[in-house]
Amino acid sequence: MDTIIYKQDLATPAQLLKSGQVVAFPTETVYGLGANALDKEAVKQVFAVKGRPSDNPLIVHVESFEQAKKYIQTLHPLAEKIVQQFWPGPLTLIFEIIPGSLPQEVTGGLTTAAFRMPNAKLTLDLIHQAGVPLVGPSANTSGKPSPTCAAHVYHDLQGKIAGIVDGGNCQVGVESTVLDLSNPKAAPMILRPGAITREMLADFLGIEILLDKHLVKESETPKSPGMKYKHYSPNTPVMMVQPENLAKAVADLKAQGKKLGLLASPKQLVGLNAELVLAYEDESVEAATKGLFAGLRALDEQDLDLILVTTTAETGLGQAYMNRLKKAAAQKIYEV
């Protein structure tokens, strides 16, 4: 199968999606692997292409809240308010759905489903032209760093999917926040941190927002992507390091003969020497979050023994950054 890159033409990829093909598309978070969410055979292809476990539910991408409502059984009393403030955007909402309205391949066999309206005009136009909602897990081989440009998708999935809609680089760089609204009588709970932070939601709604940190058991079906399976890991081992320990870590590991790649902010890298050094765009957590997956992919293409990545405080957007970094590093951190 030839994988075609589309830059302006949306009619062709929309037709491919209508006919049950798999097409990757851009969003503000990461690139998604698109298929008709109402076509279970198309959805099965997404799992096969990614090598994704079948009990890991998929997010349904819609062009409007009205489109999502066709499948939702019960609306949380805060749903409309949240949607008006944060959609389109990097926020996924989980609702109880009308039984049988979506294939169980989409829901992981649960009575709930996750919906998002991406803040990407190209993708909203694609959904509109396809005429159906689209599933859209990250368009990469399962377990690897998520793709933030079309080249990342092509690297992982060329020859396996019909096409890629190229919308340039993703602006956020990590997957959406997932907020559970499935119980109308319960307070909203974050199941996966992202760019819409716990603090943003709490400030807007005037209530405490909980963050679900429990580890999903092997026998349990996760309610949201990102809760159960190993994610975001390059082939080269990754180790976290606190910024103040970076220089010592480099010296110690180089003394052991390790070939190192470093991923950190420009100031953190001043004066350090390693086989390959990659800096985020600036010192902000936004830059670190945007550059994390792309940096891991770039360093993984080199002949390195270890990738060192600096940590940040787990507040605001730092929660999303550290959530992905901890998984990429399998929780390993350099100890002084």
Put a short name on every predicted segment.
Residues 1-336:
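Active-site-adjacent structural elements in enzyme catalytic cores
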